[in-house]
Amino acid sequence: MLPQRDTPRGGWTFYGFGYDSAGEDYKVIVGALYERYIHSVKTGSWRKLEGLDEPVHFQIQGNIGCLFNGALHWLEFKQEEGTYSVEIFSFDLAEEEFQAVLPLPTRFPKTYRSWYSDGLGIGMGTSRTGLFVYHYDHTNAFTIWTKEDEGGWSELYNHSREWCGFDLLGFQEGGVISP
């Protein structure tokens, strides 16, 4: 059980859990708009993190970090001047630093007028081979991209059909999708 700590300042909370193989330590990250904390299982203590200068915003996407290549990744949603934008930011567990934004796939929609009027569903997760992001919209187009190691994004799946809104949990063996 983790030692108690106050909820970080700033509303929407994000969190993640992962193994730092360089330091041989399990780490937990908890953050909000203005404060972020890390817990080391090895030391049994929490400490405040620095290094993410601007507030972090989550409007719709789940707040759980996805572990990929030794870093936790989150989808970040921002609202500016009537539109929403989406980016991926990450936290390197070994260096204990927030990283530059990871580019999304070229065809992944990056701005929206409204989550609701655009009929939007997007998310991110990890599979055995890497990170994946998905998108579906009012046209009933559903697309999944995967990223392995340092390479670019590859479109894994693209299909049009009636979707009733769900979050993709993972893949089955052989690349067959399990909604």
Language model: regions and residue ranges:
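Short, conserved recognition motifs on repeat-domain binding surfaces
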Residues: 1-179
